[in-house]
Amino acid sequence: MNNIKTMLCTIVALFGLTTATNANMLNGVYFEIGGSATGVEMDGNHNDNDGDVSNGTIGKTAVVGHYALGYMTDRSSSVGIDLGYIMTPGEAKINATSDDSATDVSFEVSDGTEYYIAPMINITEDASLYFKYGWSEADVTVTGDINNPGDLDGTTVAFGTLVSWGSNLYIRTEAGMTDFDKISATGKGTTGGIGTDVTVTATPKTAYGKIALGYKF
């Protein structure tokens, strides 16, 4: 996770030094597409039939793509605003198996979305810094003798840069973190399956670095 954070800071610093022109044209509705290097960390515990509690932490990294649609103000003043919606298609699945197939389960997270607002500080007519606050969601699907814990909900905080590239294009770099609400799943109690007194809880967190290319209409 420390290596990912170091890489994210380096990416943002490099793009923050980029120069371009015609930033005064960069305002209005935009569309962008990009990719992120993402690290996922999950703290959780397992409470079994005997009341024994096991705690643990797992982590994983991935590269994912996304697209976004939004609106930003121009750089005619020293401050501005960026409003938008991000969609991250795809899915990630975790499987848990045992000697008894009746207790095998899988947990899938897919199609992440985010609504965000980002106040901007316009450093020059070509570049801006911003702080972003977002509301994030993701679909959750489970299979096996376990109840669905419900979809993931969380909040995102990030900082980044916007640098114009020609009259209608721009490059966005961003580093941020998302904290999701705690989720909890219990067994269904099917005969030979997972008992209703078995509970698993987890608190997912992500850290990411993003590069995106956008087009202002």
Question: Model-found features: residue ranges?
Answer:
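Cleavable N-terminal export/targeting peptides
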Residues: 1-28
